[in-house]
Amino acid sequence: ELDIKSEASLDATSNLSSADVDKLLTGAYKSIMEPSSYSYFNIMASEIMADNYKPVKFQWYQVQYLHEHIVPEDDILLSYYYKDFYTAITRANTILRVPSATNAQKGKARYVRALSHLRLYDLFERIPLIDETYVKGPIAPSSGKDVLAFIIEDLKYAKANIEKFNVANASLVQLTPTSEAATALLARVYRMNGDIQSAGKEAEELITSGKFSISDNPKVNTSEVILKFAGNLAEANGTWGWIMSYDAKT
């Protein structure tokens, strides 16, 4: 039997270099962008159900189900919506268990966890809350209020610990969570939770920061972007970017 230390795998229960933790974060971001092989459904489902998108052509009957709010219980895509968002949550929890992870890295992991729980909340409301202390086994779903409270705590930590948005390097820092990204999502979740005063406070903080502004040209909207997870062009065309494009209607 060979006792050779792996040169490729990472043991998240041991101290890791900052660069190695960043690699784990990249995996978490990847699972946000592409929760499953049907990620266009994952990402667009709640938007279609909320009537934020007006479909031009139903290429999949599941999209029509979403738009008409008649998704049957045995729709196979429900399993993708439900379980695959937990991939990002699991990866975030792995990072939170790394002893050497910095507070900023933990903040980014908690942002990922918050966003994934929020996507699940948008679709199902009552969901199991999975944190870094979870061990395998059955877990009951939490109430909608408890889910939002959990998300808020994650985002408050993320806001307090992730680096601030650096306008001088905007095109790069837009690609990963920043303190301002947590602030923006926190405003949304406070609003969903009925806390209008706190939502307004977070939103006003972003507006008055002077770091973001409405662009006159929608094709050049860098000044508007707070956070934009981005992979390569092949991922964009092959997953959910194409279905929202002009070409999709043909």
Where are these regions (language model features)?
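Membrane-proximal, proline-rich intrinsically disordered regions
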Residues: E1-I43, A203, I214
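Inward-facing hydrophobic residues that define packing positions of alpha-helical scaffold repeats
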Residues: L25, I89-A92, L148, L155, ...
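Conserved, well-structured interaction surfaces
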Residues: D22, Y61-F124, P141, N161-E163
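Structural signature of alpha-solenoid helical repeat junctions
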Residues: N103-Q105, V112, V147, S171-Q174, ...
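Hydrophobic-face positions in mid-chain alpha helices that act as interaction patches
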Residues: A45, Y53, W60-Q64, G200-T250
